[in-house]
């Protein structure tokens, strides 16, 4: 089975961040999907936190080189596997719901710091949210 990653923020298509991180050619787009989570606006980027009753929409990519892409993503997201308490985001494997009704396990980065007064993005769709804000 393929290694998958789910992006819900500035690593999605339409942003330049994947190219700047140097992973754009090491991913293969698989389509849109959603995870059970809640989405918040932190200003420059969004934050997802697990929520069984919420939906966060994003994009699913196959990792063509997991051994290089995951460490690069860990660094960008501030995830320290040996120091999760000190990590800005933590990486977890969760079910992602695909358009054909199936689910697949994908890596996702959940926010791991206080949300403060960050407003919730009710639609769970960061791209849609940016169009109206």
Where in this protein do the model-derived segments appear?
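Glycine-aromatic micro-motifs
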Residues: 1-133
């Amino acid at each position: 089975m393929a290694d998958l990653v789910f992006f819900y923020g500035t690593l999605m298509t339409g942003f330049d961040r994947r190219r700047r991180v140097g992973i754009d050619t090491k991913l293969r787009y698989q389509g849109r999907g959603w995870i059970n989570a809640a989405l918040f606006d932190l200003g420059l980027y969004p934050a997802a936190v697990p929520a069984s009753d919420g939906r966060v929409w994003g994009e699913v990519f196959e990792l063509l080189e997991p051994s290089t892409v995951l460490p690069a993503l860990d660094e960008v997201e501030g995830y320290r596997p040996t120091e999760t308490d000190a990590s800005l985001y933590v990486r977890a494997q969760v079910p992602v719901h695909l358009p054909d009704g199936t689910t697949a396990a994908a890596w996702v980065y959940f926010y791991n710091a206080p949300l403060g007064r960050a407003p919730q993005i009710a639609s769970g769709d960061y791209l849609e949210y940016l169009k109206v804000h």
